[in-house]
Amino acid sequence: MTDAAAFWQQYLSTLPATHPHHNAIYEAWGFGDSAEMADELGQLVLAGTKTATASAVKEYEADGERIPPVGDISIILDGQNRPLCIIETTEITIKPLNKVDAQFAWDEGEGDRTVAWWLAAHERFFRRLYEKHGWTYSADMPTVFERFKVIYTAS
C-alpha cells in the first residue's frame, strides 16, 4: 500500500461508515513543478494560508484529465511524495490567467499575496510549463481557478 493509500485509509477510519467519502475516488499530487515548490506550497496549505490554486486548462486537455469538479477530493503530497493533508474542491472558475482578481491572489497565499506578485510568479511558472510541452504561452490562456478547503491532516 502506498503512503497516499494508507493516509486515505487513515482518513476514512475517522468517518462514519455511511459517509460518502468511503466511495470517493481521490487523486494524490503535489503543488508546482519541483520538490521544493511542493514542500513550500504544501506547508502554506497546512498553515491555512493557501486555500486556492490555478492550473492550465491546456494541461488537463493534453493529459486527457478532467477539470476537477466542486467536491473533488485530493491528497496533497510534499516534495518526497509523502501525504500532508486531504483537500476538497469548493469552487471552480475558468477564465483567462490575466483576469485573476485580488481576492484569489490573496487566497493563493504566495509571496506578498498581491495581484502583481501573483501574475509575475504564475507567468514564470506557466511559461516553464508551456515551454516544456512546446506550446505557445499567452497571458490570456484559459486557466482553472480552484478554491479548496482542508478536510483532513494527520495531526
Please tell me what each predicted stretch does.
Residues 1-86, 95-155:
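Mixed-charge, low-complexity intrinsically disordered regions
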